[in-house]
Regions:
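C-terminal alpha-helical cap/extension of soluble enzyme domains
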Residues: 106-167
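Alpha/beta enzyme core
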Residues: 1-95, 107-116, 123, 135-137, ...
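Thr-Gly-centered strand-to-loop micro-motif
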Residues: 99-101
Length: 167
């Protein structure tokens, strides 16, 4: 389960995540939480290693999404990830690290991040774009009998767009 309370102050984030983590663990589920704020655009707040360690110890989460310079959505330019910060986080935090906002970050940045301790990448924006491209191609192929299309046809076309992004 992803618990994102990263917009909240540290104390409130930790308290809510701790309570929800207890419930999730009681049901046999793992928990990923976010500390620092992976924003839309340039408003992000970097994850501090000392806070990250305290957060993990206090909440009992199984994985931690860290903010090292990525953002949700599209980028104007390739982001400059704070690899020195990632190294500190990797050496400080005792659970797997997650990188949100990986779409558009660039293959080299992602490879380096993974080699330095990122265990999971989120790249949804590129996949959404691929799905929309697949939909647009399907829509363009429809004639006046468009009402006869089947939902699974649309799904197949959107999935093809996602696969094209993954390749």
């Amino acid at each position: 389960i992803l618990l994102d309370r990263s917009k909240l102050p540290f104390e409130k984030n930790a308290a809510q995540v701790k309570e929800l983590t207890k419930i999730a663990h009681a049901c046999g589920m793992g928990v990923e939480a976010e500390l620092g704020h992976v924003a839309m655009g340039d408003e992000g707040v970097f994850t501090r290693p000392d806070e990250a360690k305290a957060f993990v110890e206090e909440t009992g989460v199984d994985a931690l999404a860290v903010a090292i310079g990525t953002a949700h959505g599209a980028y104007k330019d390739t982001p400059k990830l704070q690899f020195d910060l990632l190294e500190q986080l990797r050496d400080t935090v005792p659970v797997p690290l997650v990188l949100h906002g990986g779409s558009g970050t660039g293959d080299e940045n992602l490879k380096k991040a993974c080699s330095m301790g990122i265990n999971k990448l989120n790249v949804a924006y590129e996949l959404y774009t691929g799905a929309i491209d697949g939909y647009k191609a399907y829509e363009a192929s429809l004639d006046e009998k468009w009402r006869t299309w089947a939902p699974y046809d649309l799904y197949d076309k959107m999935q093809a767009g996602i696969k094209a992004v993954a390749e």
